[in-house]
A protein has these predicted regions:
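Glyoxalase I/VOC metalloenzyme domain signal
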Residues: 1-115, 133-212
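Beta-rich nucleic-acid/ligand-interaction surfaces
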Residues: 120-131
Length: 212
């Protein structure tokens, strides 16, 4: 069975996400594409504090995934909501790893294999990006190709697909950076100044994959 993302838990208030143009249900849950984002409040800390996954093997038990709090889910995919900021789906989530080999092994243990990898630089230091597909969501694992350290992996940021990147940038105004070409050919991206909006998760918006 394919492992897919059912839900992210994020330690933010619903008001912050409403200000950012997301539609938030009463639970409070934000439905983006087939995934749910449950806003659990700052009492739980900050950032992405856990996730729920469908299709986990029974052998996974109740263990976390490389230190990330993980819950088994049997919930059906969410019915997508309409959002004023133009978000239509989650493109990818960034998972920061202190030990790439360990993280890849942890994901293999739940039945997820890498699709591709890419070497790059971040702040002048070499990094390796390893990409995994969890249904409609890509998980981009990022870490050093040269060193490994102790500690858990963390879910670091989310990039959303939007219907019209220029309209989205206009919606956010000064709260978004300039629209620029993305690494993926034919796509464009803008990064939010998320803290200005009261959000604790690093957030970007990207145009859809061009039709061929």
């Amino acid at each position: 069975m394919t492992v897919t993302v059912a839900e992210f838990e994020i330690a933010d208030s619903p008001d912050a996400w409403t200000r950012a143009g997301f539609t938030v249900d009463g639970d409070p849950v934000c439905r983006v594409g087939g995934a749910r984002i449950r806003l659990v409040g700052r009492e739980r800390g900050s950032g992405i504090v856990g996730w729920s996954l469908r299709g986990l093997p029974k052998s996974a038990g109740s263990a976390d995934v490389d230190g990330i709090p993980t819950t088994h889910s049997a919930a059906d995919p969410a019915q997508p909501a309409s959002h004023a900021n133009g978000a239509t789906a989650i493109d990818h989530v960034v998972l920061m790893s202190p030990d790439l080999d360990r993280t890849v092994a942890s994901l293999a243990a739940i039945g997820v294999a890498p699709r591709r990898e890419r070497d790059a630089e971040l702040g002048g230091r070499p990094i390796r990006q390893i990409f995994f597909r969890f249904g409609e969501v890509i998980v981009e694992v990022v870490g050093s190709p040269e060193t490994a350290s102790e500690g858990p992996s963390t879910l670091w940021g989310i990039t959303y697909v939007v219907a019209d990147i220029d309209a989205t940038a206009s919606f956010f105004g000064e709260h978004a950076g300039p629209v620029k070409d993305a690494v993926q050919r034919g796509r464009r991206i803008t990064t939010l100044r998320h803290r200005d909006l009261g959000m604790s998760v690093r957030t970007a918006m990207i145009s859809a994959i061009p039709e061929r």
